């Protein structure tokens, strides 16, 4: 096959693809969104609005932890999973116990009453999992706007020169 024959063949192939695209409304491409096996079909301008994730008028996964793909960390440390009690030890469990487990994994089970639901700012917010030194749940903008102004209150989280621990030279 010569170069001119190959050029004619490629033009013919391109015309066939274009003709197939113009005559078949379902001809399009499958776009892989990322490595989590999501497939977006891009057949025409309106097809994307019928796919999962594009519909905005339904209540699909309203702010659940499965909205983000591959969000295993948030699923693992969700309050629903933490509050569930651990299974009771088996009578044969000592056969499978390793020296590492006996040395390092001897923590007592945590009580579930400490995970009492606290006020949260948005549906996925879990302020009860934040350690106390970092917990700074102040008033929201809505609460600040519609409450009596407090001039003597200073937040610990906002830098205040009177609370500064560094001495000037």
Curated annotation (Swiss-Prot):
InterPro entries: CFAP68, CFAP68/107
Mn 2: region residues: 139-149
A matching Pfam family: CFAP68
Keyword Nucleus: yes
Annotated segments matching region Mn 1: 98-109
UniProtKB keywords: Cell projection, Cilium, Cytoplasm, Cytoskeleton, Flagellum, Nucleus
Keyword Nucleus appears in the UniProt entry: yes
Compartment(s): Cytoplasm, Cytoskeleton, Cilium axoneme; Cytoplasm, Cytoskeleton, Flagellum axoneme; Nucleus; Cell projection, Cilium
Recorded GO CC terms: axonemal A tubule inner sheath; axoneme; cilium; nucleus; sperm flagellum
Gene Ontology BP annotations: flagellated sperm motility
Subunit relationships: Microtubule inner protein component of sperm flagellar doublet microtubules.
PANTHER family found in the cross-reference section: CILIA- AND FLAGELLA-ASSOCIATED PROTEIN 107-RELATED, EXPRESSED SEQUENCE EH456644
Role played: Microtubule inner protein (MIP) part of the dynein-decorated doublet microtubules (DMTs) in cilia axoneme, which is required for motile cilia beating.
Family membership noted in the UniProt record: Belongs to the CFAP68 family.
Name of this protein: Cilia- and flagella-associated protein 68
Native source species: Bos taurus (Bovine)
């Amino acid at each position: 096959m010569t170069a001119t024959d190959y050029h004619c063949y490629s033009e013919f192939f391109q015309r066939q693809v274009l003709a197939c695209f113009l005559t078949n409304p379902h001809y399009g491409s499958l776009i892989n969104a990322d490595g989590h096996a999501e497939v977006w079909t891009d057949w025409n301008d309106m097809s994307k609005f019928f796919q999962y994730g594009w519909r905005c008028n339904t209540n699909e996964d309203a702010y659940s932890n499965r909205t983000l793909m591959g969000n295993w960390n948030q699923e693992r440390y969700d309050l629903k999973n933490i509050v569930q009690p651990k299974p009771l030890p088996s009578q044969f469990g000592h056969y499978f116990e390793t020296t590492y487990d006996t040395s390092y994994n001897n923590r007592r089970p945590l009580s579930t009453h400490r995970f009492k639901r606290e006020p949260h700012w948005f549906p996925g917010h879990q302020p009860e999992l934040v350690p106390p030194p970092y917990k700074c749940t102040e008033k929201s903008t809505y609460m600040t706007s519609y409450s009596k102004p407090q001039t003597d209150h200073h937040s610990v989280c906002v830098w205040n020169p009177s609370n500064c621990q560094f001495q000037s030279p």
